[in-house]
Amino acid sequence: TTKISEILWNCSYKNLTCYYSEDSYIQNNISLKNSKSFKKPLSPDQFLYCGEAPLIVSRSLKGEIVNHIKKYKTFPRVIILKKDIYFVAANVLKAREKEDVFKAQLYFNSKSNPNRPLSKNEVKKLTSYNLFKNRLRFWFDYTK
């Protein structure tokens, strides 16, 4: 967690906490083989808390974080390093909230019913608004 925090600090993201998830459900159900099930957000909440996509580190941690920041214009909120999951947030409480939302997505995708991720247009719409202020409005738009 210290190394991730240092990389983020060097990328001008100060005051962020990196939280290592010890949740047994997440540890048992996360696999790079099933990464399609968690690569795209299923709901506005997941987009809000976990970002557009988790960072799955396959090479250099520093290089992958820098590339993620360039691609998505923000820091990675979920970092997957082999079987280890890290949540990045302003504090531990916010990181645990992200952990709960990510866990819910894993649970919903573990069921036999296929779930439809947010479309590119929905992600674009969510990106253009202040998500925290308009959270409930997005949910009502999403369920139509």
Model-derived regions, located:
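Glycine-rich flexible loops
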Residues: 1-144
